[in-house]
Design a protein with these regions (language model features):
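Conserved alpha/beta-domain cores
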Residues: 2-213
Length: 213
């Protein structure tokens, strides 16, 4: 509670499903960021739908109805996953990463979206898209989400029909078109690390320019 009497909830960030237990023990009032890229790392192939479903639903159950914000695959930049065969780029932080990669590799993306839709039946899960720059990216992601819903319905599988979908605001472009993004998103999360880095053109890991960061 702030001095002015405003109550602020304290959420935890997690990288793996098992991390949720530490969050609960330490009194987290929700999960503000589940970094799902860690599910894809240190292995030879992408996790399947059922494996992802188990991971996401276990976190939702452990949080007992409290908010769980799950970020879709945020690959690229400094997050290299060998079997995804992303071509080497001159500047990977400005290249094919995060939502850009997922929208180009829709089958991989849909596996994750299907797992999230199914897992959301077991708690208060919300989906968050990383590195969004344009409203078109959100619209395309929502279209894929609707495709997944139709597929799950046809297969007779249970899923949450009204799942919330938001974005990470972590580029100057997203800030400039925030009003338009708000019209197609259910919520915003401010990604201060990348937003500061892109705004100041400064690498937070570079001591020579750390004064800018």
């Amino acid at each position: 509670v702030t001095k002015s009497g405003l109550k602020k909830a304290v959420y935890a960030n997690i990288a793996k499903a098992e991390d949720v237990h530490g969050a609960v023990v330490n009194g987290a009032e929700g999960i503000g960021l589940f970094r799902t890229e860690f599910l894809y790392m240190d292995r030879n192939q992408a996790p399947g739908e059922d494996e992802q479903f188990e991971a996401y639903s276990s976190v939702a159950k452990a949080m007992g109805g409290r908010e769980v914000i799950i970020r879709t695959l945020d690959v690229g930049g400094d997050k290299h996953i060998s079997y995804l065969e992303i071509e080497k780029e001159e500047n990977p932080f400005m290249g094919l990463r995060a939502i850009r990669y997922c929208l180009k590799n829709t089958e991989l993306f849909k596996v994750q979206l299907r797992a999230l839709l199914r897992a959301a039946c077991y708690g208060n899960i919300k989906i968050m898209l990383p590195l969004v720059c344009t409203e078109d990216e959100v619209i395309k992601a929502k279209s894929l989400l609707e495709e997944c819903k139709a597929e799950l319905s046809a297969e007779g599988k249970e899923y949450k029909k009204d799942i919330k979908l938001g974005i990470m605001v972590e580029t100057p472009a997203a800030v400039l078109v925030a009003e338009r993004l708000a019209a197609v998103s259910d919520f915003f999360s401010i990604g201060t690390n990348d937003l500061t880095g892109y705004t100041m053109a400064a690498d937070r890991g570079n001591n020579e320019v750390s004064y800018l960061y």
